[in-house]
C-alpha cells in the first residue's frame, strides 16, 4: 500500500551537497569571503544601471529605492546557493523497516529561468521506495526549495532533486515529476498563456520497473 502526503512531517539524513560543478562554484561565491553587504551593493548598482538603460529616471520618487529592493529580492530568489544538503537534512534520516512507496505531491515551487531571469512556477511530486531509511517528510519540500531557489532550467532542477534524494537515503528508487508554467513563454516570445511543461526523472526501480513507475504516476494524478 502506498503512502501519500501533501507536504508535512519528517524523513531522513545522510548526505553531502549535490549539483553540477557550476552550482558548486556559485555556492562558493555566495558562501566565500565576499561579505553579503558587498554583494548587495554591487547588485544595487547593477539594477540602477538597468533602470537607467530602459529609459527611466532613477531619481523618480517611485524608483528611488527600487535598486535596493530588487537586489534584496534577487538575493532571496537565489538563496538556495547558500544551502548545503547535509545541513538542510539536519539528521532527519531515520531507520525504518518500510519498503513501500512514499509520495509527497503538490509541493509548490518557484524558480528563475537562467536564460531570461524570469520566473517559472508549478508543483513538484516526489516518490521514493525506502531501503531501511526514511527522510522527514518536510525535508522533501526543503530539498525542492534548495534547488529551485537558484538560476535554473526545469530539466536540471528535476534531476537535482532526484539525485539529492538518492544521496540522502540511498532508496531503492526515486521518482520526481515537475509541472510548471514558464513566464518566458507567457510574457515574451510565443506568449502562450496556457502552456505548461512537465519533466520527470526516474531512478532505480522506478526506471527499471514499468509497474512501479505506473503506480507512482497514477497516484500523483489521483485527486
Swiss-Prot record:
The lineage of its organism: Eukaryota, Metazoa, Ecdysozoa, Nematoda, Chromadorea. Involved in serotonin and dopamine biosynthesis that affects movement, mating behavior, foraging behavior, and cell migration. It comes from the Eukaryota. Its EC number is 3.5.4.16. Pfam families: GTP_cyclohydroI. Keywords: Allosteric enzyme, GTP-binding, Hydrolase, Metal-binding, Nucleotide-binding, Tetrahydrobiopterin biosynthesis, Zinc. HAMAP family: FolE. GO terms for biological process: dopamine biosynthetic process from tyrosine; melanin biosynthetic process; tetrahydrobiopterin biosynthetic process; tetrahydrofolate biosynthetic process. The keyword Metal-binding applies. PROSITE patterns: GTP_CYCLOHYDROL_1_1 (PS00859), GTP_CYCLOHYDROL_1_2 (PS00860). It catalyses: GTP + H2O = 7,8-dihydroneopterin 3'-triphosphate + formate + H(+). It is an enzyme of class 3 (hydrolase). GO terms for cellular component: cytoplasm. This is GTP cyclohydrolase 1. Pathway: Cofactor biosynthesis; 7,8-dihydroneopterin triphosphate biosynthesis; 7,8-dihydroneopterin triphosphate from GTP: step 1/1. Toroid-shaped homodecamer, composed of two pentamers of five dimers. Belongs to the GTP cyclohydrolase I family. Residues 1-28 are annotated as: Disordered. The keyword Disulfide bond does not apply. GO terms for molecular function: GTP binding; GTP cyclohydrolase I activity; zinc ion binding. It comes from Caenorhabditis elegans.
Amino acid at each position: 500500500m502506498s503512502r501519500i502526503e501533501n507536504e508535512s512531517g519528517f524523513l531522513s539524513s545522510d548526505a553531502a551537497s549535490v549539483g553540477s560543478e557550476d552550482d558548486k562554484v556559485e555556492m562558493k561565491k555566495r558562501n566565500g569571503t565576499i561579505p553579503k553587504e558587498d554583494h548587495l551593493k554591487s547588485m544595487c548598482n547593477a539594477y540602477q544601471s538597468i533602470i537607467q538603460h530602459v529609459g527611466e529616471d532613477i531619481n523618480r520618487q517611485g524608483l528611488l529605492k527600487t535598486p535596493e529592493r530588487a537586489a534584496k529580492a534577487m538575493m532571496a530568489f537565489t538563496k538556495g546557493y547558500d544551502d548545503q544538503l547535509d545541513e538542510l537534512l539536519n539528521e532527519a534520516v531515520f531507520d525504518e523497516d518500510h519498503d513501500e512507496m512514499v509520495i509527497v505531491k503538490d509541493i509548490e515551487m518557484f524558480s528563475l529561468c537562467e536564460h531570461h531571469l524570469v520566473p517559472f512556477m508549478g508543483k513538484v511530486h516526489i516518490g521514493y521506495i525506502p531501503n531501511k531509511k526514511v527522510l522527514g517528510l518536510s525535508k522533501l519540500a526543503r530539498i525542492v526549495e534548495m534547488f529551485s531557489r537558484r538560476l535554473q532550467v526545469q530539466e536540471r532542477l528535476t534531476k537535482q532533486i532526484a539525485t539529492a534524494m538518492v544521496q540522502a537515503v540511498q532508496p531503492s528508487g526515486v521518482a520526481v515529476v515537475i509541472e510548471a508554467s514558464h513566464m518566458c513563454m507567457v510574457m515574451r516570445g510565443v506568449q502562450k498563456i496556457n502552456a505548461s511543461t512537465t519533466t520527470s526523472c526516474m531512478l532505480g526501480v522506478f526506471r527499471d520497473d514499468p509497474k512501479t513507475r505506473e503506480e507512482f504516476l497514477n497516484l500523483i494524478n489521483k485527486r
